[in-house]
């Protein structure tokens, strides 16, 4: 996607004093224009929203590319011209000390650069392992632009973990983390476990695991948070959707023997009284071996984190002359070798805790602002970092958390169920 000119991004807050809208509204500034984000509530219509903000119906409809038929929960972006309103936003006196623990591998990069005779060429060389950390850091930096304009004071301490347990122990012993309010990272689970054991029950802190699938660090650690939605929570999202949309359908749960426990858990979550459920241990995944075991129309669930197994099953199902709706886990999104046309053909659904859609106003504003600042398209790591900063520093509700278990940390349960439509990920409709 090309660089979008003339856009820049600024998050502000505006508090409406009328009983018509008693919650904070995001106020967004794009290309010298203020927009107030309004969430449509029960009983509201385009006319009374227009009167409240003193903005014409035509202007609201043009800005949001919508019709006069609104629905509860819909986000509208209201263009605002009133000078008194522009200056009436809240400046915060909040302060945060934040530790960002990322694997930059600076030591390895220094060694790599030193090996080049041409120092100008060496400056452009970055060890591939560092790419994720650098992209994550860009998301944090972009969020800081907005956060600091709100008057929120951020003291950021960036620490290179090198993805090395010995280095992480050294950081913990240094006590540099003792005074932090937020600890973001480490990225990898074994290092997250070390930090959690030291600070996981410190009520003055929040420890955030941004990417890891492992939930071990949450156990008996009440100040910990996991952004990547765990399997059991993904199972609930899938089962709730199936029971609402595909009640009384034939369901087959295909699993690898090593992941039988995942299949059993998924089976328990589904309503056996209204669905015919079959579990199948897929010892063989070749099309000729399993073709006869599937019906003409069927719901297929692949509760697996095994890349090879999921890939083989999707390839095999794509070659069977039946109509399937397939449900899998969020890891499907990371398998970049999969054929999107086959995913569309199989109507593959999966929960996505990191869902991004450039056609959604909130996400498009992030995209345009990021491109304006860095002259490149943001990666998913930049988007995750930005959302974490905005959620925990600005109280923008990017996530929804629930207890992992009693006396433990919290997990993100806001994972949209998505499917590919016209080669783009879209939210699945009930």
Predicted regions: what they are:
Residues 1-29, 419-430:
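Bacterial Sec-dependent N-terminal signal peptides
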Residues 23-56:
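Primarily a LysM-type cell-wall glycan-binding module
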Residues 107-131:
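A solvent-exposed, charged loop/short amphipathic helix patch at secondary-structure junctions
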């Amino acid at each position: 996607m090309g660089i979008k000119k003339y856009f820049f991004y600024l998050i502000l807050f505006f508090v409406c004093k009328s009983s018509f809208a008693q919650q904070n509204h995001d106020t967004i500034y794009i290309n010298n224009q203020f927009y107030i984000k309004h969430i449509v509530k029960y009983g509201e219509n385009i006319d009374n929203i227009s009167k409240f903000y003193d903005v014409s119906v035509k202007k609201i409809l043009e800005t949001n590319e919508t019709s006069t038929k609104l629905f509860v929960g819909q986000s509208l972006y209201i263009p605002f011209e009133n000078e008194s309103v522009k200056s009436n936003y809240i400046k915060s006196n909040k302060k945060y000390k934040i530790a960002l623990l990322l694997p930059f591998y600076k030591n390895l990069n220094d060694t790599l650069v030193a090996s080049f005779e041409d120092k100008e060429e060496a400056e452009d060389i970055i060890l591939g392992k560092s790419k994720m950390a650098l992209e994550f850091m860009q998301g944090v930096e972009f969020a800081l632009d907005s956060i600091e304009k709100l008057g929120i004071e951020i003291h950021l301490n960036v620490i290179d973990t090198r993805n090395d347990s010995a280095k992480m122990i050294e950081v913990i012993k240094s006590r540099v983390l003792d005074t932090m309010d937020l600890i973001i990272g480490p990225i990898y689970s074994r290092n997250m476990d070390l930090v959690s054991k030291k600070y996981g029950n410190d009520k003055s802190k929040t420890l955030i695991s941004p990417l890891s699938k492992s939930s071990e660090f949450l156990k008996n650690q009440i100040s910990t948070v996991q952004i990547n939605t765990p399997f059991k929570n993904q199972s609930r999202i899938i089962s709730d959707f199936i029971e609402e949309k595909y009640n009384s359908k034939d369901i087959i749960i295909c699993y690898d023997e090593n992941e039988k426990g995942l299949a059993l858990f998924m089976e328990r979550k589904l309503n056996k009284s209204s669905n015919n459920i079959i579990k199948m241990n897929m010892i063989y995944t070749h099309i000729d071996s399993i073709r006869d075991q599937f019906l003409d129309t069927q719901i297929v669930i692949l509760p697996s984190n095994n890349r090879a197994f999921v890939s083989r099953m999707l390839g095999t199902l794509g070659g069977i002359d039946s109509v399937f709706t397939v449900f899998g886990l969020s890891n499907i999104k990371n398998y970049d070798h999969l054929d999107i046309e086959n995913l569309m053909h199989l109507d593959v659904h999966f929960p996505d805790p990191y869902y991004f859609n450039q056609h959604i106003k909130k996400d498009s504003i992030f995209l345009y602002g990021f491109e304006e600042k860095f002259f490149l398209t943001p990666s998913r790591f930049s988007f995750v970092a930005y959302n974490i900063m905005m959620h925990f520093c600005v109280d923008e509700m990017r996530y929804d958390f629930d207890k992992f278990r009693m006396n433990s940390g919290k997990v993100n349960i806001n994972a949209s169920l998505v499917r590919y439509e016209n080669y783009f990920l879209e939210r699945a409709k009930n």
